[in-house]
């Protein structure tokens, strides 16, 4: 019997060990399942037992890290960064300074060199005797004045070849968009206006200036404005085949005998004493050769543009005194800078 007891016990022992091993394996599986479930759970947030509970580490952690915290401020992430250090970082500071400086430089260049001036009355006094105006001649009104469409920067700024940088050709589109320029230092014969008859060679002078300047690109150096809204300026043009040489338009008119040096007691602009002497030498040369209006200038009845203006002013003054009422208009021609209005 004892042998049977111990034998049966010895036979069951392996089975019991096997069962124990199976139970241990089952426990391990259950532990793994529990651990996996714990890992899948969202992080625990500990709450204080009551509002009067003093702040603790867990509460602080919850207040700063819990995404569902309704008391979290919108600027928490902003104040958490060291922005002073970020701004002082050369990797951020240098590009910012370069970008800001580049924008300010472009604005300055545009204001000084690329901003278009529509009318002579819009020209800043800082231009006079210091700056120049570049543009295309759109019309010639008389033998010594014309209108120019300002094209700052020329072709380098896109004028004449970019679609939005075209010079208008229609007279309606040019209204109030051109600069009225009076050639400095010269006086051309007067066309008929204000009821005055045309002066000899006035049409010839107008035709000469039209052929010389119309639709050409010119550069004007302004000196001042007159009372008619025109700007008195020395004008240069480049003409084929000598496109690399600038030609003084006023000087060329004097050489061709189509104008005289402007004579007045005050208000004359030449652009310097050297230019005035050059103008007078050119006039003297044309006078000796009898060019243009100087043909027969020694004969009776010949008069210069200045003498013509003075004579017309006297005639209109006599009419005004006699009650004709024509002196008011006639006086405009005498008061103009560098001659009459036209």
Curated annotation (Swiss-Prot):
User: What does the record say about its membrane topology?
Assistant: Single-pass membrane protein
UniProt keyword Mitochondrion present: yes
Q: Where is the composition biased (Gly residues)?
A: 322-342
From the UniProt entry, list the residue stretches annotated as the region Disordered.
1-75, 319-342
Q: Does the keyword Membrane apply?
A: yes
Positions that bind Ca(2+):
187
Q: List all membrane-crossing ranges.
A: 93-109
The molecular function terms of the Gene Ontology recorded here are: endonuclease activity; metal ion binding
Localization of this protein: Mitochondrion; Membrane
Family stated for the protein in its record: Belongs to the LCL3 family.
According to UniProt, the name of this protein is Probable endonuclease LCL3
The species this protein belongs to is: Paracoccidioides brasiliensis (strain Pb03)
């Amino acid at each position: 019997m004892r042998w049977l007891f111990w034998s049966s016990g010895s036979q069951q022992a392996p089975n019991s060990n096997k069962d124990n091993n199976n139970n241990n394996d089952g426990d391990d599986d259950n532990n793994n399942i529990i651990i996996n479930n714990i890992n899948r759970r969202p992080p625990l947030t500990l709450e204080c037992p009551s509002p009067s509970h003093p702040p603790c580490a867990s509460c602080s952690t919850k207040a700063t890290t819990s995404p569902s915290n309704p008391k979290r401020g919108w600027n928490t992430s902003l104040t958490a960064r060291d922005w002073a250090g970020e701004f002082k970082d050369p990797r951020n500071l240098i590009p910012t300074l370069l970008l800001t400086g580049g924008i300010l430089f472009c604005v300055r260049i545009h204001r000084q060199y690329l901003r278009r001036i529509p009318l002579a009355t819009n020209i800043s006094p800082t231009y006079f005797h210091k700056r120049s105006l570049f543009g295309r001649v759109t019309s010639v009104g008389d033998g010594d004045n014309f209108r120019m469409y300002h094209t700052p920067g020329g072709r380098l700024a896109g004028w004449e070849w970019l679609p939005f940088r075209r010079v208008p050709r229609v007279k309606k589109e040019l209204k109030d968009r051109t600069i009225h320029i009076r050639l400095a230092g010269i006086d051309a014969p007067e066309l008929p206006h204000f009821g005055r008859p045309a002066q000899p060679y006035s049409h010839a002078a107008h035709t000469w200036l039209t052929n010389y300047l119309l639709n050409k690109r010119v550069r004007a150096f302004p000196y001042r404005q007159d009372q008619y809204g025109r700007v008195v300026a020395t004008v240069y043009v480049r003409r084929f085949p000598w496109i690399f040489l600038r030609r003084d338009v006023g000087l060329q008119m004097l050489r061709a005998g189509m104008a005289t040096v402007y004579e007045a007691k005050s208000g004359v602009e030449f652009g310097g004493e050297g230019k005035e002497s050059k103008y007078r030498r050119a006039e003297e040369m044309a006078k000796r050769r009898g060019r243009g209006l100087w043909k027969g200038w020694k004969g009776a009845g010949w008069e210069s543009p200045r003498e013509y203006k003075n004579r017309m002013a006297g005639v209109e003054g006599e009419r005004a005194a006699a009650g004709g009422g024509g002196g008011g208009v006639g006086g405009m021609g005498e008061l103009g800078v560098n001659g009459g209005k036209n």
